[in-house]
């Protein structure tokens, strides 16, 4: 299917419509909050969601009804897959070199496998590097042990099971609190990008018969 010329790649981070769709999480938050958040947390693989969040925060500021955009974008990766984290901490727009075999090895050992992207839109104009600079943001890391810990803590506290990638964001929030990077009176948006799998599985499975079968002949 992917090799069929009639089907085109949707463009990833360069697809404006995709970014607009991903950025609606900020719109929903502001609708409830009544203002632009002070801090935004998200786990990143490509960083497109964080880019989209920042773009929408800028639009909300231009609208004028939701206050100034002082939203610091705080993102996180699952170690040892730390390409963007390493580049950011080195204050570099360029990602460090990573051999394909080493990239695959790191991708295999992390729990949040969806965060393993070897070619993210990090250093391009308007990419994640620019977003972190413009927002005075920062990067965090979460180990597999951190993910398991915060998965259980969130389930016990909120009654909801998160996917590993979302737990990376929760871990980043906890680190930021410990390091004094967020204030007690600040408005915080924590983007929990997925969950509910355990709850859904506990209800069992229903295999639906197909409504239409197309013969390969």
Where do the PLM segments sit?
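Active-site/ligand-binding loops adjacent to catalytic centers
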Residues: 1-10, 17, 59-161, 205-217
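Active-site/ligand-binding-proximal alpha/beta "capping" segment
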Residues: 1-64, 148, 152
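Short beta-strand segments
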Residues: 10-13, 42-45, 74-77, 189-193
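Short, well-ordered secondary-structure micro-motifs
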Residues: 21, 52-53, 84-88, 200-202
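Buried hydrophobic positions in well-ordered alpha/beta secondary-structure cores of metabolic enzymes
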Residues: 29, 40-41, 73, 132, ...
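Nucleotide donor/acceptor-binding cores
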Residues: 38, 71, 185-187
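Short glycine/threonine-rich catalytic loop with a Thr-x-Gly-x-Asp
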Residues: 44-47, 158-166
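Catalytic phosphate/nucleotide-handling subdomain of diverse soluble enzymes
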Residues: 170-217
């Amino acid at each position: 299917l992917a090799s069929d010329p009639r089907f085109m790649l949707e463009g990833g981070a360069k697809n404006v419509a995709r970014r607009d769709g991903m950025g609606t999480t900020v719109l929903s938050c502001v609708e409830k909050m009544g203002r632009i958040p002070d801090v935004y947390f998200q786990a990143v693989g490509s960083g497109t969601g964080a880019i989209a969040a920042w773009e929408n925060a800028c639009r909300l500021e231009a609208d004028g009804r939701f206050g100034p955009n002082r939203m610091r974008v705080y993102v996180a990766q699952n170690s040892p897959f730390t390409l963007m984290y390493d580049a950011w901490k080195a204050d570099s727009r360029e990602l460090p070199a990573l051999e394909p075999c080493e990239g695959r090895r790191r991708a295999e050992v992390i729990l949040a496998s969806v965060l393993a992207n070897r070619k993210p839109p990090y250093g391009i104009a308007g990419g994640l590097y620019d977003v972190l600079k413009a927002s005075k943001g920062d990067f965090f890391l979460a180990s597999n042990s951190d993910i398991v810990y915060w998965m259980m803590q969130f389930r016990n506290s909120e009654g909801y099971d998160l996917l590993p990638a979302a737990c990376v964001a929760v871990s980043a929030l906890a680190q930021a609190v410990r390091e004094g990077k967020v204030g007690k009176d600040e408005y915080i948006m924590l983007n929990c990008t997925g969950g509910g799998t355990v709850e859904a599985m506990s209800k069992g499975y229903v295999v639906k018969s197909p409504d239409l079968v197309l013969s390969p002949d």
